[in-house]
Amino acid sequence: MGEVIAVVGVGYVGLPLVVEFGKIFRTIGFDSSKYKIEKCRKGMDPSREISDIDMAMAIHSEYSDDPADLELADFVIIAVPTPVDEARIPDFRPLINASRTIGAHLKPGAVVIYESTVYPGATEEICIPELERAGGKVWQRDFFVGYSPERINPGDREHRLTNVIKVVAGDSPATLEKVAALYETIVEPGVHRCSSIKAAEACKVIENTQRDLNIALMNELAIIFDKIGIDTTEVLEAAGTKWNFLRFRPGLVGGHCIGVDPYYLTYKAEMVGYHPQVILAGRRINDGMGKYIAEHTVKQMIAAGSYIKGARVNVLGLTFKENCADLRNSKVVDIIQELRTYGVEVFVHDPEADPDEAMQEYGVRLLGWDDLPRADAIVAAVSHRKFNTLGAEDLSRKLVKGGCVIDVKSAFDPAVLNAAGLRVWRL
């Protein structure tokens, strides 16, 4: 294959595609962000997920913010965000804008492949009409469309683009085979073919909806067990001795996928006349966990004898999950905002997050570990590997005598912390 590949969006999803395809084909990474393009041209991943060595191995890759370069591509892969707005309604603006840009610069006969997560039917109902209007072209005559939902998991060093089966679909059997053949050049386990684009779209939203619901169940169990006076972690470890018990843990559910994608499915369900109940119930539970954790932090501080107004809390971790720099839709922010409503001073430390981005996105100033004050409580919100070396002595130095540790991810041994005179509560 001597084709030219273009990838629109060089973020967490798009850049791995540019790098892997760029080892084989001429591959153009396109983004409207000049900052991202300049970083990539220097051989650096703006998100720090891909090493400089891997970036350098993509000898056929190039980067551009000029949409005219898209006219060179035989395949154009779209990997832009699909968020929800404040009312939790799908926000298609990034996808629509990308489709318009591509449609205006589409090579005759090109295949456009969408990787962005959408509800079943959105590619054909929303995206393809934008491609046609922008370029005055006719679908299935002048261009063709495929779909292959992204499965990138930020911070995961084991499950990567090249070793996870890729689901593919096309607007015709011929397009499907072209899309399958393209991805088979970089994905070692191969591809799974779907008979329709809608089926592939549905596949992605239920992958994340299933996980969201399982975590919601764990969160609800954690709330119940806390009221009963049972340690959730102990219960889950005991239940996990049965072969078919699913090993999920309670926690915050944020990020660009799990906390967002279910709303795409429920939106479509409402469109076709069905009001989903289980999915939305799970979303309500997970969306409320930041407030729940903040309330328990306050209760623990009161029990320890702290005055709440003017109390200090150190929060460890701001990213939406461990071992990555991604701050999108972080639910740690819910904890911070709720604590501030009580008059608590909150200080945040995250060695993975970008300080400028934290300030820009959330107005949160990140401090180094040494700059954290002695506080009434520590909320261990994100279990980065870099926090694994922290022991009871380290935590004690950042707490007043008898201070509280709120261990969201059960990362610390409560017996060790109790022995050091620390009060511990964990989800």
PLM regions and their residue ranges:
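Structural/interface elements that position substrates and couple domains in central-metabolism enzymes
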Residues: M1-L427
